[in-house]
Amino acid sequence: NIGVNSVFLARLFVYLHQFFEKKRNGTMQSGKIINDPVFGFINIPKGIIMEVVTHPTMQRLHRIKQLGLSSMVYPGAQHTRFQHSLGAFFLMTEAIQSLRGKGVEISDHEAEAVKLAILLHDVGHGPFSHVLENTLAPGVHHEEISLLLMKQMNRELDGRLDLAIRIYKDEYEKRFLHQLVSSQLDMDRLDYLRRDSFYTGVTEGNIGSAR
């Protein structure tokens, strides 16, 4: 029986792996629209952005709560780092469109890269987000881990994250692109203020991000 069960489980594993790979590949070729409770429909275009969104390193953020243990006090705070990353991506898309409308020159490659940078900005978070950050790896901040994971993904993706990493590290000549990712008024903050406010019911963070 043990031998039969082992063969069955092995075949099941292979089948499920092939099934999800086909589904993932099909999604990457067609893109995806996600309905977000904070911002509404978010369009995930096919190509490198979809590859990053569906990558296992990114998908693990589904299981990491944005506010750690805050749900013990605010039961509605069940939202995840994955949701936050998509929200920040949406705001980055809006910001790029707004800047272009004001005459700021941003190439398609730069626009794609800065969207990738904001998508991956929190990929280094561990269990319970900030709660265990200094316990699991003392002296190492999640931004450093995010960069390490981005570099690993970049190797897997044949260097297609090169510009995104340069923007993330503030090594690209158009420094305002980095400021959209990390500054006193970036897409990260604009999303988590609204998102945390929405899910906790605390109105103080409900700012007008569209402005």
Residue ranges and their predicted role:
Residues S6-L9, L16-F20:
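Short hydrophobic targeting helices and cationic amphipathic motifs
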Residues Y15, N25-K65, M72-L116, G124-R211:
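Sequence-structural signature of the catalytic-core scaffold of metal-dependent phosphohydrolases
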Residues N1, N5, K22-N25:
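Polybasic, lysine-rich low-complexity intrinsically disordered segments
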